[in-house]
Amino acid sequence: MAISSTADLAPSRKARGSESNDRALKLFIELLSVETQQQLFRGEPCIQRFVEIGPRTILSTMAKRSASIQKDQRSSASCYSPEFLSYHDNQPEILYQYQNDQAIYPLSQPTQPQFEPTSPSHLTKRSPSPSKALPMSAIPSAELTLQAGHVILAMTAQKLRRRFDQVPVEKTIRDLSGGKSTLQNELTGDLVAEFGRVPEGVEDQPLSSLAESFQPEFSGIPGKAMSTLISRFISGKMPAGFNQSAIQEYLNSRWGLTKSHATIPLCFAPTMEPARRLANADEARAYLDDLVEKHAAFQGISLVPSNQVADGHESLAPVVMNVADVDEMNKRTKLYRAQFDSLASYLGVDYFASEKAMSESESRIAELEETIRLLNTELDEQFIKGIKPSFNIKQVRKYDSWWNWSREELIRLLNEICQDSSSACPPDMENRLQNLLNKWDANCSEIVRAHLIGLQSRSSAPMNKLQLILEEIFTLGNQTLSIDPLFVHNLPPMGPQTIITDAGCLEYHELPRQISHYPEAMAYGPPWPQGHTSAPFIHIKTREDGQDWMYDSKATSIYHAMLDVGVTTGLTFTHKAVLVTGAGPSSIAASVIQGLLSGGARIIVTTSRSISQSADFYQQMYRQYGAKGSSLSLFPFNQASKQDCEQLVQHIYGPDSPTDGDLDYILPFAAIPQVGEPDAFGGRQELALRAMLVNILRLIGFVRQEKERLRIENRPTMIVLPMSCNEGTFGGDGLYSEAKIGLKALFNRFYSENWSKYLTICGAVIGWTRGTAIMQTSNAVAEEVEKLGVITFTQAEMAFNILALMTPALTALAEDTPIYADLTGGLGSMWNIKQEISAARKRISERQILQIAIAEEDAREQAMICSASTDVESGLPTTRHARLGLQFPPLPDVNEGYPNIEGMIDLTRIPVIVGYSELGPWGNARTRWEIEHRGDFSLEGYIEMAWIMGLIKHVDGHAKGRPYVGWVDADTETPIQDYEVPHKYHKHIMAHAGLRLIKPTKLDSYDPSRKELLHEVAVEEDLAPFETSKSTAEAFKLRHGDCVTLLPIADSDNCRVYIKKGAVLMIPKAVPFDQVVAGRIPEGWDPARYGIPEEIVQQVDVTTLYALCCVSEAFLSAGIKDPYEIYQYIHVSELANCLGSGGGPMKVIQNMYRDRFLDRQIRGDIILEHFVNTMGAWVNMLLLSATGPLKTPVGACATAIESLDIGCEAIQNGRCKVAVVGGCDDYGEELAFEFANIKATANSTEELSKGRTPADISRPTASSRSGFAESAGCGVQILMSAALAIEMGLPIYGVVAYTHMASDQIGRSIPAPGKGILTAARENGQAKESPLLDLNFRRAVFDAEVALINKSHPKQATTLKPDHSETSNAASLRIRDAQNRWANNIRLSDPSISPIRASLATWGLTVDDIKVVSMHGTSTKANEVNEGNVINTQMRHLGRQMGNPLLAVCQKSLTGHPKAGAGAWQLNGCLQMMQENIVPGNRNADNIDKQLREFEHIVYPMESLRVPEIKATLLTSFGFGQKGAINIMVSPRYLFASLSNSDYEDYRSRTTKRQRSATPTFVSRIMKNNLVQVKTRPPWNDPEAMQNFFLDPNSRVVDGQITRAPRTAYKHQDISVPQSAAVSVNEALHAMLATTDHSSPAASASVGVDVEEISSINVDNPIFISRNFTLLERDYCLSAPDPRASFAGRWVAKEAAFKSLQTTSTGAGTAMDQIEILEVGGIPKVVRLTSQLHGHAHEVAFAQGITNIQITISHCNNTAIAVALALRKND
């Protein structure tokens, strides 16, 4: 009773004696073990010493274990731990006998930070320098010898992976090992090996006690185990030459340690091993110095290093030699020289030859240097770099999958039209439709037909309009099937407009010209001087003998006729082959390519930029404009390189030609920007001249050579020369005009040289083209220039002008004579254009300056008129804050249109997904989804990624010395706002996430550029000896026999080992491995950041860490903050753990096999972590504490779906109600190496050489795919029966409609792709007509059967929900049987129906309702073809409607292939697609393999598509070893349709509350770095009741208390949102005040509040119960489901009631039965005092005029809270 008192709280001596006597009596009488221990360790006051008197240490050990368990259950106020002593082992302590022996451990140990292995990079390099002072010896303050305690401490610390000075010696082995029995057993075995024997119960004795036990028999030198550790340390970490003797010698010379003393730090050395072998002696000395300093600090002694360093660098006296010695030395030198000369003469060796060769080499080098200097001087470095060849046939990209892009674009267009049926005209509809018609095929017609069929049942005005549009598209599409694609220029003529705004800003616009018909506008011409013939703006010129080029009206009319065709019927370029150079963004050539692609041409385009930078631009161009039969091949090419020109032409005319070995047109438009007048010409100008003139001529020559070689004489290639009207008129543009003028010479060469039958010439003199890279800055003056009577062009207009020159009519004309096309728009006749442009710029500038001045004057005038004090809205920019969340699924209204399945579904057998998570190359599921469907991150995504990668952390305190709450940079501690995160960390995140180059990390030091292997070598000569321990030396002898000789070292246990000739050694070597790209977890990921304890991180495999993170986050995504909440609804045996793995714990396996073979130091119990099921075991031990089945599927790449299948099966057959499913694998170098050996993975080194980036390595369905890219990670789903999910109010992300596993046929190939999952579609022809597929039929039969059941059981309620009462159990079973037969599994009645069709029919869906297929898509040649074939065959067999293709999603293009986690990530993607109705594209599929074209039921989108609704998804997964898997998910909306409106609204309300509670918890755990909540105890507080709990199927756990209140599958209960006690009290008080019955208008009140932990109420003490609770209260509480919680509630109510009286307490021992709490109207209340309060309580209440006390009781977590309101009646 919490009542304050001033009395002394300590009991008197007499009272203490009485209590001791009472306890002694109880212990004497109650001989049962359990009761005895409870009295000992739970009673008050606590015992201080437990002494066992007997021949052995038995009872004290048992008592200590029991006390540790009892201690965990005591409140935080419990007393300290007692001391356990045995007369056998602790006689001096019992008798209080103390020894004055030398202290083995210091009295106090300094607190040290958490140990990390010493890295050599952290060691200070000590450079000895000569000193003038005399050398001084180091003398330690105390001379120590090796004690048993040192060895025990060193061995224990080494096992625990801690530094020796971080292990508290007062703790036991059991405490230090954290209760891990294997570690205790291993350490005990090592102690036995070291000391020979150990006392019984060694694990429960403090290290200090063990040291005293072992010390009397300790020899003072390391034993076998310790010597092995030292030897292994020296051989594995110290540099060559630093053996044990050398180390001891250094410690003596440097620190003055004797050999015995030096052994102590040597024993401690294995506890602080450096991360890698120390590279040299300096690093070794620095390491040893650090070791000795820590040893001295630990021992509490003083050590001062000597200034003399024992490495030969100490100060030395001058050396003096006499003359005789010098003469003798010279004689010997002459003798050696004579012998050398004689031997060289005898062998015929000219030792001057090397000097001669060196002289010649130096001369040659000098000549080359002079040549290079000359080239750099004449041409300069820029020219030399500019001619470097870049042509690389391996980097060629080819795009020709127009057939797939047509389907994707059509589906996108139809979706946009259907989604906006009111307008039904998306932007740019005409151009998009024209491009689409150019690539139309029969599949497109089927797609439109399918949409039209779907509209027939939706009659309305908008639908009728939509139907007309689709019918028109259908008609136009069918018409184009039999004609060639056409380029139609349907853009109006555009003119420039420059506007100066009121504020003085310059704005450029383009407006349609007055003449809307482009050829008509071009037919006009500029004003010509009198006497000259007027020519159109664009025209053809010819030349007569002796004349200049003149306007040719006849040829011009032909040209303009082609322009007319181009804007009406269109131009076709089908079967034409074109080479285009210089087609960069915003160029004229790029617009030409667009027209050529629209016309069906096959194009070769070159780029001078890197392929990885430019490929996207051309691929997007092809996707938009590529027509039937068109192709686009992209080549790296430098037009300034002669080699490139030659190699390009040779390839075009070679056997692998992309244009069938010839060209129809060449457009050499490549140009190099240049400026400068003649006095400033340099290498760049010469380079430009070479590219724009010289190498164009070379191209002509190379083409002529190839055509002549191949005898192609009847198909001349037209070269469209990019000429210019700028023939020096602009000036200051380098050699640009000279290059263009030089091209004119080809008009004469056509006649004077003999290549005219192979090539023809068309010179296109290009006019002012707005918007190009060159003319972009001159757009503003274009309008002024046009005022001079000329015309300027857009890029599309100039491209159209050029395309008209490439028509058959003009091509035929060019065969007779070169064509001179004047496309200048009249600009070519202006010789003073530069002056005009300058004047135009000046006029615009003057107008702009004037307008700015006017605007400033107006502003000042307005300021004066409106008063300067008038504040104007400044529109301060708002900063957005991130809203982190779990992205719960929406809970929409279930409107009409869903199938009538209410009550038909047995929800206890329907598995649903209520939570999911993943950890992969792109972070978690939310961040991966953003990058997958958006291509970038949202603000929230950036923050989550930055947190995952350790770039930011959250601070709630101070930052930079100021109070601050928010994110800070993890390195600098600088505060950073949410909106700053994307800009600051974008580059880092993108470079260190996803598929990327493999680099050594903190978790894995693997470097593929230096893959280590062992090479066997036979020794050919005796090797120099080395020193090692005796045991190791004997092991060498055992292995090598006579090839090894051992020589013991005096005064040492070590031996010197001599390796003789004939011995076989394994020498490490490093080779580069070509797999250098993988999708590893984002760099910087740290399990400790998720809240996983460091001891767990050090012990388990990384796959277990992944799983722990994912399972924790998956439960949060289900709105479950504590997994133990589930046990309020199910028995612990009904939760299954089905997590699987394909490769298992790779790092542990590597350590166990490789490192053990290499005799490296690894844990002795590592075998426990090597089992595949260990991952699931850790998840259960640390998070779940379930007793359900732990199943571990191993299905290679299909593991996750196999896990899903197992979980669904467990739920469907009723064995479990919840299952944790998924898969996890890590990246391992061994696995990667073997995958590469079978050619399953892409050779990333080769791919990088092809111009691919690491992100492009995985390209599922692409024609260039070459294998998958490996990745790592984990994916998890929380699977649950739908009934339980609805009962708990959990979010439902998707319904698992079907899972299926299949193997395959006879064969010999394990990785061969199989077709076994075709069986999921098995059915005969009659099955399609089965009446069971008619939902109306099944509804009617089901209703009739339920009516009969209700008639047979009149007591059964009319509802379809079974209540599981005894009287209605039979009816419930019959109803569930009917549900199963007519809905859940209709194949029970007709097995001929395919499983896929039946699973969809349950929800009133058909195979046509599947919208998306998430494909396994590994990016291998075989898989995509096989998988597409299997899916297409299934759809065809099931009768899927033509024109309704599945949208394929290939997630591995983004994530790579994680093996076991692949299916889980795919499944998560399916859930996200259904939630947002977005189908992400495969951005790496730049060109779809033509082998996939035959699969008419599949479309492979490259960009994300938004669709109206996704009702169902299909998922396929294939694993090596005949593992085929398929899964169908259904939208949760259909599950909601099976509920009544009232049930759904109730579910929606409770789920919304849960989501609102879970989101803040998730955000808080992110900010506090405790996302993973590791459990330290099972969900029950009383371990003794565990057995009964396991055996009772109705047992449940509520707030740590066991209850027998079973919940039915259909009973809905409100979610109790856990809150803090303070919040609960506040809410309870407000609720009470709101409901208080104020019968009297004049009343006052006083409040009392009390809070108590439920576990602190000892309901097992009958005296306590009888003294404080009345008989009625006892009867009420004992009949409650949880008596302890009920008593706790009554207790705090009594306390609160007493506090509300506001009187002085009579003592803590006062009985509380004077206050009785009864139920009045369902509300706990203190009734009228006259009959219920007694004694002192009644007197106080009566004196204060209290007439009524109202109380409210609530429970929060493991706490009971009560608020009492005492009402007084005022006079």
From Swiss-Prot:
Official protein name in the record: Fatty acid synthase alpha subunit pkiB
Region (Beta-ketoacyl reductase): 575-771
Residue positions binding acetyl-CoA: 1650-1652, 1676, 1686, 1695-1705, 1719-1722, 1753-1755
Transmembrane segments annotated in the record for this chain: none
Organism per entry: Emericella nidulans (strain FGSC A4 / ATCC 38163 / CBS 112.46 / NRRL 194 / M139)
Record domain Ketosynthase family 3 (KS3): where: 1011-1531
Induction: Induced by oleic acid and stearic acid, but not by linoleic acid.
Regions annotated as coiled coil: none
Amino acids binding Mg(2+): 1650-1652, 1754-1755
Annotated family: Belongs to the thiolase-like superfamily. Fungal fatty acid synthetase subunit alpha family.
EC number: 2.3.1.86, 1.1.1.100, 2.3.1.41
Gene Ontology terms: biological process: long-chain fatty acid biosynthetic process
Residue ranges occupied by any Carrier domain in the UniProt entry: 143-221
Catalytic activity: acetyl-CoA + n malonyl-CoA + 2n NADPH + 4n H(+) = a long-chain-acyl-CoA + n CoA + n CO2 + 2n NADP(+); a fatty acyl-[ACP] + malonyl-[ACP] + H(+) = a 3-oxoacyl-[ACP] + holo-[ACP] + CO2; a (3R)-hydroxyacyl-[ACP] + NADP(+) = a 3-oxoacyl-[ACP] + NADPH + H(+)
